[in-house]
């Protein structure tokens, strides 16, 4: 898409949204498989597919990519608060979640029942020395979410009532919702 055919702010938003979904896809893959090949450039078709056989990246490199992508794109979303599209809040929530996963994996590296399955290449497992940095990134993203007004649904004094109402409240009335699928 050229910048002349669409407003610059919309173009930045759509590009940020595409990068968000790419990072989200990498998050789902790294949780499932550990390190996966990280491809950020468009690949061209060629007769010999050998150059397309990219080796797995370290698990930590995938988490680092997700976190850095969310930091890079968060301002491109502007002040949009649409709960059914990627926004700055959704980017910070994904950063928070990815950093928490990576931080707890690293923190528990030496206690893991699957430690013997970790590959020496780093494709699986994250060394414990990285735990503090990931957990700090998680807390920073959480603080940004709170500063944007996201919080637990607390309309009633009774916690059980709040829990029940959180699922039936209109999306615009629920400060817990960051990124959701809308139903009529």
Give the positions of each predicted feature.
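Conserved, well-structured interaction surfaces
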Residues: 1-33, 49-85
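An aromatic- and glycine-enriched ligand-binding surface/loop that stacks and positions planar moieties
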Residues: 15, 34-36, 40, 63, ...
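Short linear capping/connector segments at secondary-structure termini
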Residues: 42-48
């Amino acid at each position: 898409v050229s910048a002349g055919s669409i407003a610059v702010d919309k173009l930045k938003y759509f590009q940020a949204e595409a990068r968000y979904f790419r990072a989200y896809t990498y998050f789902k893959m790294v949780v499932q498989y550990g390190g996966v090949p990280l491809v950020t450039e468009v690949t061209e078709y060629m007769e010999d597919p050998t150059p397309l056989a990219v080796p797995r990246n370290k698990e930590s490199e995938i988490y680092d990519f997700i976190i850095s992508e969310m930091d890079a794109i968060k301002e491109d979303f502007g002040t949009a608060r649409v709960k059914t599209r990627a926004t700055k809040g959704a980017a910070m929530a994904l950063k928070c979640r990815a950093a928490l996963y990576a931080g707890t994996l690293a923190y528990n590296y030496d206690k893991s029942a699957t430690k013997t399955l970790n590959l020496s290449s780093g494709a699986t497992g994250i060394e414990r020395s990285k735990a503090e940095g990931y957990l700090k990134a998680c807390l920073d993203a959480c603080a940004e979410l709170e500063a944007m007004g996201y919080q637990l649904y607390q309309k009633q004094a009774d916690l059980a009532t709040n829990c029940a109402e959180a699922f039936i409240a209109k999306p615009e009335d629920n400060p817990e919702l960051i990124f959701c699928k809308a139903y009529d």
